[in-house]
Every structure is written in C-alpha cells, then in structure tokens.
Amino acid sequence: MEHLPQIQDTLRIASINRNYCWNGKSPDGRGAQSDLLLESKADRTDYLCEMKFTGGKYAITKNDEEDFLNKIEAFAASKMHNKTHSIQLVMVTTMGIARGEHASIVNQSVVLDNLFSDRKTQIL
C-alpha cells in the first residue's frame, strides 16, 4: 500500500507488524470485510481501516454503523484477531467525518491531506 507510512504516522502507530485486507463472518453468519487491517503489537491494537471517498465529509448512516459493528464483531471473533489487542475503527476519507448521530462509532480519522502532507490525525 503506497500510503501506509503516512497512515501509520497520522495515527501515531509506533510499529506495524502486519497489514492486510481481511474478510470473514460474524458469529451470526453475516459476511464482513475490511479494506485494510493494521496490527501493532507495540500498541496492542488492531486498526480496522475503512476507506470512503466522497466529495465532502462522509456522513455515517445507521446502516453504516450496523455494518461497522458487524465488521468489528466478526474480526473480534476471527482467528486473525489477537484477543489481547483492542480494535479501533479508523476511517480514511477524502474530507473527514461529518458530525452526526452515528459518527461516534469511529475512533480515528485519516483524511486525504494526511496522505500528502505532515498533518496529523483528526481524533473524534
């Protein structure tokens, strides 16, 4: 991934042990996939990254929130997740996340400018 160093720097991740795309099923059998997973043993955190590209701030809908919760639940139940790690939902978007009823599901946000400059994370 071309911009992995910028994402790592923006999120202030000390080291990334593995990065990959992931797919699996939640305990109730629903499918789930993540655009990018970053594992950091140093931070004891798995960063589940969702990428959304729009002309403005991305507004998270109720359906998005349910989908993200399903992805988190599915990954938490998978063999790929180190059970001692926390899971953080990271949105990589063009212009950031619009404030709204469902935005609190997101732990951190990376915007397009972060990928091409030294500006840091937008923590929600």
Please identify what each model-predicted range represents:
Residues 1-124:
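A cross-kingdom feature that marks ATP-driven nucleic-acid transaction machinery
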